[in-house]
Structure formats: structure tokens, C-alpha cells
Amino acid sequence: PGLSVGPAEPTMGLRGGHVFEVSFDGCLVPEENRLGEEGAGFRTAMKVLDNGRIEVTATCTGIARAALAAAVSWAGQREIDGAPIARFQGLQWMLADMAVDLDASRLLGLRAAQLRAQGQRFSAEAARAKLHASEMAGRVTDKALQIHGGYGYSRHMPLERYARDARIMRIYEGSSEIQRNIIARNLLA
């Protein structure tokens, strides 16, 4: 009885952190160690998730920023017929779309963080920021891989890690579907 921690779960991405199963069996917590008021656990957990969604937005922005920088660098270095692939208009449009997506996510995250810092309600804004940023990170890493061609699929390139790490962002701190529910609930309230 009590607290038990299982073995580390191997994960596809985010290998800098570890995932463990934690079990509480007959575990008694003294009242002075309780977080929040009795019966308010769900509300407390939701506030933690709202804060976490801003952090996920920042993480997604960082992943996408690194992927975009890699794509821009590669487009300037990689040559076809003696000229960089950056000369192709289609590739330029991909880079432009990636940059716009990245800026939109950054600004949505800043708005949610600003509301939090001002002590205002920010649940819907955090959900919007997290939804956009997590899906944006997937789009941007995918386009960066496309720009790199076959080299982008290599495990020797950092894009492999960015793509793996971007994928979990649409799941934790509430999946994209949950974010849509939160946003819609706030719109319809």
C-alpha cells in the first residue's frame, strides 16, 4: 500500500523527459499537504492545464522556429542545376506560410499569457493558442521535411526529432479535440 512508481515508459518523442505510471493504493495524505480546498480537485487540475497550455504553445513555437530555420538554411544551401532551391516560387510560398503560421501561434500564446498575467480569465485563449500552435508545429515540421527531401527523413537530421516532438503536442495538456470543445463551450456560453 501507498505510493508506487512503475518503470519509465519509452516514448516516441520528448526523450529529455520521462513518463512513469504512478499508483496510489491506500495512500493517506495529511490535510496540511492537500492542494486546494476539499472537493475542488477538478477545478484545480483545470487551472493547471490552462497554464500548461500556454507552456505547450511556447514549446510548439520553439519546435516550429527551429524547423523553419533548418528549412530556410537548407533551401539556401541545397542546389539543383547549380542554383539554390530557394529560387523556386513554390518553395518560397511554403516558407512564407510556415512563417505566418509561426507568428500567429506566437501571438496567440502571448495573448493568453498576457491575460493570465493580468489575472483575467484565459481558459479559452489558452485553448485557442494550444490548438493552433500544436497543429501548426505539425504542419511546419512536415513542410520542413518536404523541403529537405530525402535528407529530411534521415535520423541524422534534427528534423526527425522535431517531427517526433511535435506530434505529442496535439495530445497532451488536452487533445486538439478537447481544445475545440473548450473553445466552442466558451463561444456558446
At which residue positions do the language-model features occur?
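Alpha-helix capping/hinge segments and adjacent helical runs
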Residues: 14, 120, 127-189
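Short alpha-helical scaffolding segments that buttress acidic/His motifs in well-ordered protein cores
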Residues: 45, 71, 112, 163-166
